[in-house]
């Protein structure tokens, strides 16, 4: 029997991250029967910081850096990430070799009781500045309370009565078979999702041309174009996970549309921009939308947020 070549996949150990890695594993093995994939679970620095706010500890990059370190040290061949956890720009030594077909990108509200009985001053759990900003516009009287942990942990905290509602990504709930917990889907044009939300990125080394060729079979063109435009917005703005920035691109009837927002965390200021164009110019459209945000006062707002 010919021994199959082994591909080592590194990922976080959370149930959602392991689901995503297993999905990528199956896609690779189905497309390349001569390959066998092995998943290596990694507890990242972000996972270890269970009580501190991410904004006080280095941001969402803490969920990515340890996985990237494994790639650079050649302890793994590929890393599987949630795109929304990644920086806007790839470093010179690493690249996203495949964008997996995007799941539902919307944010959703999960309520402890019934949506109809949610009080105007409800305690809503989220740690995302983007969600906090838009929640204050959606439900001005609500009280925002920090929440950390994976999907299961957050749902358990809601069920235990620490919150009256929480906001999560629809994609994670659907992938884990928890769609029945969703009470309300936010309109992505009004409550704009995180950059790359719902998309999985498979990262590899820039000098590993064999792996890049292999990953092409997994790459979903429409997802790549949409995420490229969204990431370009943040690349030009220079925001981080502490900045209330959102961008969401869609392709419908051959029309490419990009929506973006920049705001203050208290929701008192929200700047929006929209652009329609050719999907082949995804990055240029992203830069153009970012420029529109800056021209509407986003430049001074960013300076204020970074002080």
UniProtKB/Swiss-Prot annotation:
Task: Give the domain of life.
Answer: Bacteria
Instruction: Tell me which InterPro entries the record gives.
Output: HemC (IPR000860), Porphobilin_deaminase_cofac_BS (IPR022419), Porphobilin_deaminase_N (IPR022417), Porphobilinogen_deaminase_C (IPR022418), Porphobilinogen_deaminase_C_sf (IPR036803)
Per its record, the protein catalyses: 4 porphobilinogen + H2O = hydroxymethylbilane + 4 NH4(+)
Q: What does the record give as the function of this protein?
A: Tetrapolymerization of the monopyrrole PBG into the hydroxymethylbilane pre-uroporphyrinogen in several discrete steps.
Assembly notes = Monomer.
Recorded hits in HAMAP family, A to Z, give: Porphobil_deam (MF_00260)
Q: What is this protein called?
A: Porphobilinogen deaminase
Species this protein is from: Coxiella burnetii (strain RSA 331 / Henzerling II)
Q: Which gene encodes it?
A: hemC
């Amino acid at each position: 029997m010919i021994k199959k070549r082994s591909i080592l996949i590194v990922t976080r150990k959370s149930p959602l991250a392991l689901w995503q890695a297993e999905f990528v594993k199956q896609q690779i093995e189905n497309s390349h029967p001569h390959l066998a994939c092995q998943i290596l679970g990694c507890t990242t620095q972000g996972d270890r910081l269970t009580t501190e706010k991410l904004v006080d500890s280095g941001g969402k990059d803490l969920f990515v850096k340890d996985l990237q370190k494994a790639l650079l040290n050649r302890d793994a061949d590929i890393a599987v990430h949630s795109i929304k956890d990644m920086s806007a720009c790839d470093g010179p030594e690493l690249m996203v070799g495949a964008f997996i077909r995007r799941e539902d990108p919307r944010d959703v509200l999960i309520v402890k009781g019934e949506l109809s009985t949610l009080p105007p001053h409800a305690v809503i759990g989220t740690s995302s500045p983007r969600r906090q900003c838009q929640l204050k516009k959606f439900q001005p009287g609500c009280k925002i309370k920090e929440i950390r942990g994976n999907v299961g942990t957050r749902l358990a905290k809601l069920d235990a009565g620490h919150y009256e509602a929480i906001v999560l990504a629809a994609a994670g709930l659907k992938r884990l078979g928890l769609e029945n917990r969703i009470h309300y889907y936010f309109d992505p044009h009004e409550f704009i999702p995180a950059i790359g939300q719902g998309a999985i990125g498979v990262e590899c080394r820039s000098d590993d041309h064999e792996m890049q060729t292999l990953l092409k079979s997994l790459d979903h063109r429409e997802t790549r174009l949409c995420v490229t435009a969204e990431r370009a917005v943040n690349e030009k703005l220079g925001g981080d996970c502490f900045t209330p920035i959102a961008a969401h691109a869609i392709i419908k009837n051959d029309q490419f549309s990009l929506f973006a927002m920049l705001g203050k965390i208290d929701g008192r200021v929200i700047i929006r921009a929209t652009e329609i164009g050719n999907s082949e110019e995804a990055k240029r459209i992203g830069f153009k939308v970012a420029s529109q945000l800056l021209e509407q006062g986003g430049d001074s707002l960013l300076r204020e947020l970074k002080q």
